Swiss-Prot record:
Renumbered residue ranges of the record's region Disordered: 26-47
Keywords: Cell outer membrane, Lipoprotein, Membrane, Palmitate, Plasmid, Signal
GO annotation, cellular component aspect: cell outer membrane
Organism: Borreliella burgdorferi (strain ATCC 35210 / DSM 4680 / CIP 102532 / B31)
N-palmitoyl cysteine-type lipidated residues: 18
Highest classification ranks of the organism: Bacteria, Pseudomonadati, Spirochaetota, Spirochaetia, Spirochaetales
Stimuli inducing this protein: Weakly induced when grown at 35 degrees Celsius.
Protein name as annotated: Lipoprotein MlpJ
Role of this protein: An outer membrane protein that may participate in pathogenesis. Some human Lyme disease patients have antibodies against this protein. The Mlp proteins probably undergo intragenic recombination, generating new alleles.
């Protein structure tokens, strides 16, 4: 009888320990299921990040901004300190870098609005890009004729001075991020280069 009692106690202990493991496993499974549900719910609650895109006006303005600065750097590189002696890549690499970041493009297009609208009002029957490129070409090819009819400013080629001046200051920055920040800030300013651009016009 003693042996039966011992066997009975051992079997109870054995069953209890097996049941204990099952309880722990069930508890772990339940906790994992709860944490998965919480994680799934929290992921569902996160708003889908909207893809940033440019409006047609922003795209037009950004494209003009890039075209005008690239054209200025190409035509007047020997008058832009950081682009002299064949070092145009430093100046142009920024635009390649910028092509990857829609948010920065959007911000620059917005910052360029004031300059764009001012110069567009002076362009008369020409497109914006044609008008600005004409001012750059005049400086490059026939500087003595740039003041005729005050087309690019009263008594001076203010358009060329503006874009060359900003490009020159851009080229003195050390990184693409610094160039971006400078350009954005400069486009928003009402003094400095912008004041020089807008100061002397007859029409």
């Amino acid at each position: 009888m003693k042996i039966i009692n011992i066997l009975f106690c051992i079997s109870l202990l054995l069953l209890n320990s097996c049941n204990s493991n099952d309880n722990d496993t069930l508890k772990n499974n339940a906790q994992q299921t709860k944490s998965r549900k919480k994680r799934d719910l929290s992921q569902e609650e996160l708003p889908q990040q909207e893809k940033i895109t440019l409006t047609s006006d922003e795209e037009k303005m950004f494209t003009s901004l890039i075209n005008v600065f690239k054209y200025t750097i190409e035509k007047l590189n020997n008058e832009i300190q950081g682009c002299m002696n064949g070092n145009k890549s430093k100046c142009n690499d920024f635009f390649d870098w910028l092509s990857e970041d829609i948010q920065k493009q959007k911000e620059l297009a917005g910052a360029f609005t004031k300059v764009y609208n001012f110069l567009k009002s002076k362009a008369q029957n020409e497109t914006f890009d044609t008008y600005i490129k004409g001012a750059i070409d005049c400086k490059k090819n026939t500087p003595q004729d740039c003041n005729k009819n005050n087309k690019y400013g009263d008594g001076d080629n203010l358009i060329e001075q503006y874009f060359r001046g900003v490009a020159n200051d851009m080229s003195n920055r050390n990184s693409n991020e610094e160039i971006y920040q400078y350009l954005k800030d400069e486009l928003l300013k009402e003094d400095n280069h912008y004041a020089g651009l807008t100061a002397n016009w007859q029409n």
